[in-house]
Amino acid sequence: MSKLFQARFATTVNDTHYLPATPLREVAFAGRSNAGKSSAINVLCNQKRLAFASKTPGRTQHINYFGLFAKDDLLAYLVDLPGYGYAAVNHETKYHWNTLLSDYLQEREQLVGVVLIVDSRRGITDLDEQMIEWFVPTGKPTHVLLSKCDKLNKSECKHTLEAVRKQLQQYDPALPDGNGESKQLTAQLFSSTKRIGLEEADNTVIKWLFEAETNEDEITN
């Protein structure tokens, strides 16, 4: 059973000053409104309504924290970031969201990686690129879930995955010529509806959150 199955709602904040004062590791989920972010969190945690999934874009307007527990011991956090790119909000709200996201991504020390949900039918948009550009300088990894891949045929899936991986290479400072396989920015196909790519995504998140713990166990043994 995945450790993600033990997720429970912890807290919600609308200002980085009120983020949990804890040394525990965090993995954040980000993405455009209606890209399937909440659905991805729910299916990975094997829960129907842990993160609120709505057909109305822009419903996630705060930073929502979900704690991962072993019995009553809090081990780590999953973080649901506000969806971006929703047009029907005023300028002041958009500015607040942008500031909230950029400050969190660039300054949160406990954040060990970002899962970026991208609609496979749209590919990486300008706003997705902005998220990547904010986070890449931290040196921490980004893993792209190409959501709703069940809407594409096999050929389209292959082409989309190859194109996105090549696009991500351009942002990796370890690949100055934009060629080669990026270790910091990775991508996979994913579908919450058809449960495609769950194991790969789960393994990535678990590795980020508990890698140090695993390494310590190996050294001890």
Curated annotation (Swiss-Prot):
This is Probable GTP-binding protein EngB. The keyword Signal does not apply. Mg(2+) binds at S38, T60. Residues 23-211 form the EngB-type G domain. The keyword Metal-binding applies. It holds the Pfam family MMR_HSR1. NCBIfam families: GTPase_YsxC. GO terms for biological process: division septum assembly. SUPFAM superfamilies: P-loop containing nucleoside triphosphate hydrolases (SSF52540). Its cofactor is Mg(2+).
